[in-house]
């Protein structure tokens, strides 16, 4: 990709470099891809972000690099050929949905909601979903290293978009974790705790380790 031609193998393998160079908006994608993509793709993505997107953009370099892989060592040519391949790429479809991807002729399911799994409705304390008698889900944080365009936890995860205001965790992390542990101590029937988020890859190791030790 044009903007990363001079990146070293050491930089590429560095998790902090990957985080620092995530694609977060259309302008950054344009800088990265250069003339590989036609203008119509950028316009399509920009319209989706303004009118339909439920997730903000956050795509790390490694994920961008998996889109439109070379076939027998040959990449599609810049412009129309690469743009068509980019539109058709399954990872692009999942990570960077555009306006033309969305089927407006198919209505949403009648029971479709922002929180389709009703996790928030079943919070025992903030961030702890107790749906089944012996199992709970601990949502430790509302962020991920990358944002999938069709996240099933979109009500909580990521930044708000022009048409979608996200649910915000009100408590401080240390207070939320303490409340979760207190509830679990008072609920001995729970045997299975799924520690999730967001993605715990974004959680400082000492905080995750401290929670698991107490758990």
Q: Where are the regions a protein language model picked out?
A:
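Flexible, acidic/Gly-rich N-terminal and inter-domain linker regions that tether
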Residues: 1-130
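Conserved, mostly hydrophobic/aromatic
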Residues: 63, 144, 148
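Conserved Radical SAM active-site core
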Residues: 104-139, 150-215
